[in-house]
Amino acid sequence: MAVSRQTSSVAGIPGAPQRHSFAKIDAPIEVPGLLDLQRESFAWLVGTPEWRARAQAEAGEDVRIMSGLEEILEELSPIEDYSENMSLTLSEPRFDDVKSTIDEAKDKDINYAAPLYVTAEFTNSMSGEIKSQTVFIGDFPMMTDKGTFIINGTERVVVSQLVRSPGVYFDASIDASTERPLHSVKVIPSRGAWLEFDVDKRDTVGVRIDRKRRQPVTVLLKALGLTTQEITDRFGFSELMMSTLEKDGVDNTDEALLEIYRKQRPGESPTRDSAQALLENSFFKAKRYDLAKVGRYKVNRKLGLGGDTDGVMTLTEEDILTTIEYLVRLHAGEKSMTSPDGTEIPIDTDDIDHFGNRRLRTVGELIQNQVRVGLSRMERVVRERMTTQDAESITPTSLINVRPVSAAIREFFGTSQLSQFLDQNNSLSGLTHKRRLSALGPGGLSRERAGLEVRDVHPSHYGRMCPIETPEGPNIGLIGSLSSYARVNPFGFIETPYRKVVDGQITDEVYYFTADEEDRHVIAQANTPFDENHRFTEERIEVRLRGGDVEVVPYTEVDYMDVSPRQMVSVATAMIPFLEHDDANRALMGANMQRQAVPLLRSEAPFVGTGMELRAAYDAGDMIIAPKAGVVEYVSADYITVMDDEGVRDTFMLRKFERTNQGTCYNQTPLVDEGDRVEAGQVLADGPGTDNGEMALGKNLLVAFMPWEGHNYEDAIILNQRMVEEDVLTSIHIEEYEIDARDTKLGPEEITRDIPNVGEDVLADLDERGIVRIGADVRDGDILVGKVTPKGETELTPEERLLRAIFGEKAREVRDTSMKVPHGETGKVIGVRVFSREDDDDLAAGVNEMVRVYVAQKRKIQDGDKLAGRHGNKGVVGKILPQEDMPFLPDGTPIDIILNTHGVPRRMNIGQVLEVHLGWLAKAGWKVDPDSQDPKIQKMLETLPEELYEIPADSLTATPVFDGASNAELSGLLRSSLPNRDGERQVDDFGKSNLIDGRSGEPFPYPVAVGYMYMLKLHHLVDEKIHARSTGPYSMITQQPLGGKAQFGGQRFGEMEVWAMQAYGAAYTLQELLTIKSDDVVGRVKVYEAIVKGENIPDPGIPESFKVLLKELQSLCLNVEVLAADGTPMELSSDDDDELENANAALGINLSRDERPDADMDVS
């Protein structure tokens, strides 16, 4: 049998649809795995066999490699008691198989986790006894293949955090009073006290330890054991240091130590030993101070220290001395110095926003830090137990309490700012969420304190973080997205690839550089012209130098070249065609809005793509990919069976109509037929929002740019009725409803069909258990699950006692607490899940049974829904016209969508116009005549690839970012477009058509730009926003209606609205709004009564909020009274409560409902 071929690169995805690309530049490497950021980091944390093999090969056979968990255990071990007679060592972390599958974890609301075990070894050095045991540490959440975690049944993702790297940072500032430059330096560790040196305006060098009071730097040097002579020998070149030495006021090491202790711990009496211990612990003990590998690397790089200190994670005396020397030389204006190992190093201040000084904490490191916190809490417990337990009977398990560790992990995944609910709106939004970089979170910045500099685009972001994709609003610039080709190195710095250039010859060697390495090289752009031999064609080349400066240099000076034009942008931005013609603000909206697109009923790939669609969909993980080559044996909507070339049968289950986190529909559909030959890496089934293996978030619609009777004013959109009738823009949304039956003080709740005071017609769709049947059409107020709850026993009337005597327990009081469809929701029941204690399902304490009902809703496009293109051109559907009223092409084809021309010029997103032209060409097809004398066609032929001379109708095209179709090419192709079957071209050489008005049959006076644009239906649907209330819950204190759709609240009639009413003199309307329609508790019941009985509406009473105001003032000891017309004080107490209850009882309503979430919504 043929050996199966494992696919390594995704470049040649077998069976991929053909896209005709306008790209001129071939990248020497493929885009790396788009989820590697998450997967690789987690593989390092847990130490998977694949990671070990790869890391060992990179490091060399004789180097010991350690996973993230092994690192922490080694750091922690040994845990010794206070007398150092006993010690506990933890090592060899290992995992058992995961306890449940991903689907089970989602179903049962549990974690997708594997049990973690470590080997614990207890040593009693007095008796020489060693006891070793395997200890269970807890269930450790595992990452799924898609880079997510399942926590309590929901899919979450851990976002990578951008933080300032540990290291040494030099800074310059201007003194406000003397206007002289001052310099300072911070030594920032990963863990431990900060050490700061500075030169002040009095020309002394000072030091601050852990942000306490400043003291002369020579005090610290003397405390470290240096004599005055040694200080003079080292720093004699600096007047600053010599004057500081004279003024420091301490003579020897002991005095210096005591002086430091007094500043660090004011109010405590110092001793030499305690002062020595304080200094040692602050900077020279690994338990208290940790530079981390990355910090040591940065310090050595900056100060030019040799490799002797590579493994030392604390500060050394040499570090401190060299830092001070660098600082005084920087202040003196020197440009370079000789480092201790003899190399010449440049002297300069640091830019904290430079990506050489900011690093990523990826998933693995974030979880590792959390486990470290848990283990250090556990360490304290172990120490205490060593001292309290009998030494003979101690075993490792008796010492270890694993609760703090599992609690720390649980807390991180459940509540950390960086553990987020996965955005599953579509495949792209999930992929982008996993590639997100956040500067927020613990140890990062906060929104309020982050200034403009840190949010701004920095030259070092090039090829590392996308300059376009970031949220609008308070988080702008603090949250970014990883660029397409970027990867993260072991230190957490982002690297981007470059091609090596030797004497103007471009090679295919690719090197990855961090931002500070890149600064040392001269780098050309990817679109620099070169010939077929890969040599530059121009003598002088435009290049990028340090700090983002652009210069023109001779080609021999170029060191490297970008690998691809789309290297600087993220995946979502790289999916915007003609990005180079869009204003950056609109491109930002376009990149963000693609993530809000709802998967449609039938996905359709864009006519105009960028070539990124295939890769993004492939790596997002929502499609089914064949792992090995073979032949398809069986295909159905539910599963696909493939017999691979080794004779092994693989079955792939398709996920059908599942609910995502955002309530969109997750459905997979097969692409292959029985008997098909499939290769390794071929797509077997499409996911939501993919078409034939490509990302397909919207629909290709025939667009005309024209105003239409003012109905598309201000970005409104006019749609063809066909979009509704043929379900072109229809999506499916699934809602989940959950109810549980608990034990209450009065007895257990019961899920039943036997509900009091409910007619048989209401129960028609419930089965014998009281649960709605699958397939039932339900609307708001319908019962989904019948449930009754015992009522409190009250004093029985004689009649009830008689009934109780005759029927026994049957007449026991229960109330209806059934789960009903919420207000405004409709749909079809597509799934029911029942969990009960009897079936041994894991349920929360006190819960006997839980039922989940899934209701699907088919939402057609309607007025008020939001549509958008990929260029930030968004709008709301303003009118849906019948097909016959839409403008139509000369051959009778009606337009699908009319966009206003005013939406283009001032927004400067011209990309949408070019997309429309190329969309028309892709739909109509084109054939270029190479012998044509037309100058436009001649100009086009200079750049158009030969394989694009003839393209059939209904083809897919790709115009990659910064390397796509040029204006000249589009202009030439519009002259070469194919006619329709009648032999007529519908669109002229300028991409315009003479449209005819569907209502009158008259042609419009001017030609109109017509073509195909890819339009997305966004998740801002009018169905989810529209809301109305008649009666509903009221706030407990003010008795005013609650606010918002979620609380079934009312509309706020605010201060400005009140003024408007006053201005119009609408006194009675205003009084009604502020009393009986709001918080006049008695009045609103009387009004309801009057409406029911058909009487006149009574006069309003006193609003409840006025009474609250009085009470507030009285609580401030102000004796505020309300006086009647005759001057006597009025009592505002609620005498009307009885009246209220009588009215409520008589009318069968409750208009004084409080804000309890289960307060009944319906007026019976």
Curated annotation (Swiss-Prot):
Transcription listed as a keyword: yes
GO CC list: DNA-directed RNA polymerase complex
Catalyzed reactions: RNA(n) + a ribonucleoside 5'-triphosphate = RNA(n+1) + diphosphate
Example of a GO MF term: DNA binding
PROSITE patterns xref list: RNA_POL_BETA (PS01166)
Keyword Transcription set for record: yes
Keywords per UniProt: DNA-directed RNA polymerase, Nucleotidyltransferase, Transcription, Transferase
Annotated stretches, region: Disordered: 975-994, 1143-1164
One GO biological process term: DNA-templated transcription
Any one Pfam family match given in the protein's UniProt record, by short name: RNA_pol_Rpb2_6
Bias-annotated ranges (Basic and acidic residues): 981-991, 1152-1164
EC number annotated for this UniProt entry: 2.7.7.6
Family annotation (InterPro entries): DNA-dir_RNA_pol_bsu_ext_1_sf, DNA-dir_RNA_pol_bsu_external_1, DNA-dir_RNA_pol_su2, DNA-dir_RNAP_su2_dom, DNA-dir_RNAP_su2_hyb_sf, RNA_pol_bsu_bac, RNA_pol_bsu_CS, RNA_pol_bsu_protrusion
Domain of life per record: Bacteria
Function: DNA-dependent RNA polymerase catalyzes the transcription of DNA into RNA using the four ribonucleoside triphosphates as substrates.
Stored NCBIfam families: PRK00405.1 (NF001616), rpoB (TIGR02013)
Family listed: Belongs to the RNA polymerase beta chain family.
Subunit and interaction comment: The RNAP catalytic core consists of 2 alpha, 1 beta, 1 beta' and 1 omega subunit. When a sigma factor is associated with the core the holoenzyme is formed, which can initiate transcription.
Protein name (database record): DNA-directed RNA polymerase subunit beta
Source organism of this protein record: Corynebacterium jeikeium (strain K411)
Organismal lineage: Bacteria, Bacillati, Actinomycetota, Actinomycetes, Mycobacteriales
